[in-house]
UniProtKB/Swiss-Prot annotation:
Coiled-coil positions: none
Enzyme class: lyase
Gene that this polypeptide is encoded by: rbcL
GO cellular-component term (any): chloroplast
Other notes: The basic functional RuBisCO is composed of a large chain homodimer in a 'head-to-tail' conformation. In form I RuBisCO this homodimer is arranged in a barrel-like tetramer with the small subunits forming a tetrameric 'cap' on each end of the 'barrel'.
Cofactor: binding comment: Binds 1 Mg(2+) ion per subunit.
Subcellular locations according to the entry: Plastid, Chloroplast
UniProt binding sites for Mg(2+): 201, 203-204
Protein name per its UniProtKB record: Ribulose bisphosphate carboxylase large chain
Domain of life of the source: Eukaryota
Organism in which the protein naturally occurs: Keteleeria davidiana (David's keteleeria)
Function according to Swiss-Prot or TrEMBL: RuBisCO catalyzes two reactions: the carboxylation of D-ribulose 1,5-bisphosphate, the primary event in carbon dioxide fixation, as well as the oxidative fragmentation of the pentose substrate in the photorespiration process. Both reactions occur simultaneously and in competition at the same active site.
Modified residues (N6,N6,N6-trimethyllysine): 14
InterPro entries: RuBisCO, RuBisCo_large_chain_AS, RuBisCO_lsu_C, RuBisCO_lsu_C_sf, RuBisCO_lsu_fd_N, RuBisCO_lsu_N_sf, RuBisCO_lsuI
Residue list for modification N-acetylproline: 3
Length: 475
């Protein structure tokens, strides 16, 4: 370690304020396999040098504070401090750069996303010397990821539980999202599952409101999926949202879902919090429940290019905290999602080993070792004409979820489900026969519609529907 950056008690205490870069900017540092690495997009205030801003991020997210303190001499800062070890400019942005920071593993509690984020994305994001700060990516070493349980079950176990292979799974969010009685809600669930969907879903807003208390909804939905299973011979599921105002209430709802014998529950992991989510994920593994995760509130955190946190970081955090599904955008629907960026974090959710690839926004090679993968869920403004693109973009290990694209069918809920099931089966068959879905997708749908009146009606209704807006977050 360079003498310039070494801190020893024998040097003696000198009160006052000194530049962060004297202690926390260490370009000669060689990162360790056990370090947690972070890539920050930094926009410093005018007059603040990049090295000082990067060092300030490292300091304020680890051991530093605004002034020298005498208790620095009672510990080894060289062992515990974060280090800004590299800085690179952001192409096309004169006032921005990427600061790379290495954190020693001992700074973080084992198995706690809450503690990890409290440091790395804590008070440093309000630091006055920075105009804006965004966490673009994290490298989680196996020595830390192995302290987490991760997803309750993972992709392969879920397929085995459902006995469904070789195609994307199909879902539907029940609409209107608020206002239905529990019995009418259960009726919609039954019709969608009976029509051919694998899952239906509580909207993230649905908890336990006066128009539909949670226990009534759970009972009617369980009745609906049992009836649909008996009639179709397929295993069905409904994402019963266990999110609640307290952890105790959340667990009470999850326990009741297990007693009903349903296969899957749901949690809003950002509004509910990582501590609650991890607790629920542990319960789900111990009790055989799959766990669907909704990302409500994510755009507040990740949508701005210059400040906040990229969704790929939230995706990694969810994989550690625990979830078998997570919403991941659609690329083609109504919600934000650029193709290369989306495919980058989809790989981070599903794969065991992901190479660094800046063209897809992946700043670090990530090795998840044996941690199970998470199914990405494509949901938001999608319909049957999107099916070829969704099948081509997301592949088999995904959930394609059509809310309005099922319930908005002119003939009703069950025909809407039939249309989606026929469309996905046609796309998978065409792909397996070697056809190019990106080029021939519309023709594949038209051919299938000739022998499926439900699909033909859906194609006619949504033939002009598009969501063509420029993506805000891009590489």
């Amino acid at each position: 370690m360079s003498p310039k950056t070494e801190t020893k008690a024998s040097v003696g205490f000198k009160a006052g304020v000194k530049d962060y870069r004297l202690t926390y900017y260490t370009p000669e540092y060689q990162t360790k396999d056990t370090d947690i690495l972070a890539a920050f997009r930094v926009t410093p205030q005018p007059g603040v040098p990049p090295e000082e801003a990067g060092a300030a991020v490292a300091a304020e997210s680890s051991t530093g504070t605004w002034t020298t303190v005498w208790t620095d001499g009672l510990t080894s800062l060289d062992r515990y401090k974060g280090r800004c070890y590299d800085i690179e400019p952001v192409p096309g942005e004169e006032s921005q750069f990427i600061a790379y920071v290495a954190y020693p593993l001992d700074l973080f509690e084992e198995g706690s996303v809450t503690n990890l984020f409290t440091s790395i994305v804590g008070n440093v994001f309000g630091f006055k010397a920075l105009r804006a700060l965004r966490l673009e990516d994290l490298r989680i070493p196996p020595s830390y990821s192995k302290t987490f349980q991760g997803p309750p079950h993972g992709i392969q176990v879920e397929r085995d539980k459902l006995n469904k292979y070789g195609r994307p799974l199909l879902g539907c969010t029940i609409k209107p999202k608020l206002g239905l009685s529990a019995k009418n809600y259960g009726r919609a669930v039954y019709e969608c599952l009976r029509g051919g969907l694998d899952f239906t879903k509580d909207d993230e807003n649905v908890n336990s409101q006066p128009f539909m208390r949670w226990r009534d909804r759970f009972v009617f939905c369980a009745e609906a999926l049992n009836k649909a299973q008996a009639e179709t011979g397929e295993i069905k599921g409904h994402y019963l949202n266990a999110t609640a105002g307290t952890c105790e209430e959340m667990m009470k709802r999850a326990i009741f879902a297990r007693e009903l014998g349903v296969p899957i529950v749901m949690h809003d992991y950002l509004t509910g919090g990582f501590t609650a989510n991890t607790s629920l994920a542990h319960y789900c593994r111990d009790n055989g429940l799959l766990l669907h995760i909704h990302r409500a509130m994510h755009a507040v955190i990740d949508r701005q290019r210059n400040h906040g946190m990229h969704f790929r970081v939230l995706a990694k955090a969810l994989r550690m905290s625990g979830g078998d599904h997570i919403h991941a955008g659609t690329v083609v629907g109504k919600l934000e999602g650029e193709r290369d960026v989306t495919l980058g974090f989809v790989d981070l959710l599903r794969d065991d080993f992901i190479e660094k690839d800046r063209s897809r926004g992946i700043y670090f090679t990530q090795d998840w070792v044996s941690m199970p993968g998470v199914l990405p869920v494509a949901s938001g403004g999608i319909h049957v004409w999107h099916m070829p693109a969704l099948t081509e973009i997301f592949g088999d290990d995904s959930v394609l979820q059509f809310g309005g694209g099922t319930l908005g069918h002119p003939w009703g809920n069950a025909p809407g489900a039939v249309a989606n099931r026929v469309a996905v089966e046609a796309c998978v068959q065409a792909r397996n026969e070697g056809r190019d879905l990106a080029r021939e997708g519309n023709e594949v749908i038209r051919e299938a519609a000739k022998w499926s009146p439900e699909l033909a009606a859906a194609c006619e209704v949504w033939k002009e529907i598009k969501f063509e807006f420029e993506t805000i977050d891009y590489l």
